[in-house]
Amino acid sequence: MSIAAKEIHLLHYPDGVPTTEDFAVRDSALPNPLDGEVLIENIWMSVDPYMRGRMTKRKSYIPPFELNAPLEGHAIGRVMQSRDPRFAEGSLVTSMTGWSSHALLERDYLHPIPDMPDIPPEKFLGVLGMPGMTAGVGLNRIAYC
């Protein structure tokens, strides 16, 4: 049984401010997970400043997004099916995945979100995620604040 997924593709590199015409929603189908794989349903996706720099052909510290393919970014998802004992169905994970409603990933590309009742899970895409780490390094290692 395959899982129907929706993906957001970059159609062409924007000239100036990105518009809806630069993107398209496409259908895809994911197979059931094999040993060591986990099927997740993405709940939150992060839209970060570095992504605009990847919407160009210019060389940078990270490769540009591929055209006619899902954009990539950090996400939080709920495990739907798991073929790995470390990831229970229903648990929350973070990953770097395509902009898609669902993703099939190997266990090494997933990180469990700890159960912290007072902290909303989406904070792991902001202050407790890559943007927060970037800010911390910038303040503590570069600016010496």
Language-model features and meaning:
Residues 3-8:
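Short structural boundary motif marking the start of a folded domain
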Residues 30-47, 55-99:
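Glycine-rich beta-strand-centered segment in the early N-terminal region that forms part
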Residues 18-29:
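Short glycine/threonine/proline-enriched tight-turn/helix- or strand-capping micro-motif at secondary-structure
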Residues 10-16, 45-47:
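Short polar catalytic/cofactor-binding loops
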Residues 1, 26-28, 103:
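Generic detection of short hydrophobic beta-strand segments and adjacent strand-loop junctions
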Residues 73-78, 88-145:
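NAD(P)H dinucleotide-binding glycine-rich loop of Rossmann-like/cofactor-binding domains
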